[in-house]
Amino acid sequence: MGQRQMHLGVYAVGTGNHIAGWRHPGATTSGEDFEAFKTIAASAERGKLDFVFVGDSLAFLVEGHPGQMVRFEPLTLLSALSSVTSRIGLVGTASSSYSEPYTIARQFSSLDHLSGGRAGWNVVTTTLTEAAQNYGYDELPEHDLRYEIATEFVEVVRGLWDTWEDGGRVVNRQTGQYYDPSKVHALDHKGKHFSVKGPLNLTRAPQGHPVIVQAGASTSGRQLAARYGEVIFAVQLDKDECRAFYDDVKRQVVAFGRRAEHCNIMPGLVTVVGRTDEEARAKLAQLMEYVDPTSAMRTLSRRFGHDMSKFPLDGPVPDLPLSNLMHSYNKVASSKARRLGLKLRDLYNEMALARGYPLVCGGPATVSDFMEEWFKDGAVDGFTLLPAHFPEAFDDFIDLVIPELQRRGLFRKDYQGTTLRDHLGLPKPENRFARAPQASAAAVE
């Protein structure tokens, strides 16, 4: 067996991932620039990354980061990108709170067909009151109820993906038979939140099921991730917290009857890369000159689900109740603050630097050392890269860090397959409706 290698994806934001990255000279500045996303996807494919990840929000957010203000709908964008790429995985976000299982099943199955088996669905429950108000509700459903709905939602979608067995479409011009009725099945789901008959009006996707991605860190979020998640986009601020998260989720994965290696933990990582450490630090210092202080505080408040501007920056991080909006960052940041004795200003500075994600700044060796340590210490299976801005900061990573990771044997030099499941080392799911092969009745002579 060869050396274990890490997985890498990139979180594609037209305005960059640093809170002020879009202000950098030469940076892309729009979430509506298809050419910019084509460039990101091409660089990701050139670097042999596993996937491009496109997030979403269902509302216009008056927040510090313009990536939350204007953005393409992910499935539309990824369908377009499928026609100008050939290997890179295409992961898009869609909400289980403001769609229907049949719609989501069709959309991601369509993307999987269009891309030749490269689709992934990032399941979110939506944390924005503004989104609820755009869909006819005054408030979000309660946190645990959102995850209860999401669990049934995902189960229905996976069931719909199985309603066609492989080989269900026959297309026999001589006999006039188009499909095999014995290989097409009704789902007939009747649950607490959804009633869905099926079958899907698409044949089985090339991957069987598009890859399921999840990012929950709350108790109910981790349960959803462990039950179904094949990639986990974790929000962890340091290695020890991430290793504890990793061990907990993997334990739950096994408890659900799955194999631990079929769930890849890939936390977000903001990267600022230079040819040397000194050059990288100069790049980060330049970025910080562009930061609007109020935008960092607004972002910090949204991540906590409370107005943090009411508290003194040089005081302790307040012990606040979990809001109905976001549990993940509040729990992780509060735990870190208690453990390390951090002040609110420390979290504010982290938000200004990297919007609450860990940040690594340095030359190829420094960045690779950081990633290798987390990987070999059992905290991650890889990373979802959040370059400070596009295209330059991402190209710096591809051109400088990827060769160093490859030299160390930590990352692939070429793709070994064509589908996202191939890249991630995931099997094609069995079809729940497929009949077991009949045992041979031939006599033994």
What are these regions (language model features)?
Residues H65-V91, V254-F256, F394-K413:
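Alpha-helix-loop-beta-strand connector modules within alpha/beta enzyme cores
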Residues A20-E35, T93-Y102, D138-L140, P206-T219, ...:
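Active-site mouth loops of central-metabolism enzymes
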Residues Y329-L400:
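Substrate-recognition/cap regions that form aromatic- and gly/pro-loop-enriched pockets
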Residues G2-Q5, E100-Q223, R227-Y228, V254-F256, ...:
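Internal, glycine-rich beta/alpha segment that forms the wall or movable "lid"
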Residues Y135, E142, F153-R158, R243-R251, ...:
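C-terminal helical cap(s) of enzyme catalytic domains, especially alpha/beta-barrels
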Residues M1-T85, Q207-P210, R435-E445:
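N-terminal beta1-alpha1-beta2 module of alpha/beta enzyme domains
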Residues M6-V10, V52-V54, I88-A94, G117-V123, ...:
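Hydrophobic faces of well-ordered beta-strands that scaffold small-molecule active sites
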Residues G31-A44, Q214-R227, G363-D377:
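Short, acidic/polar
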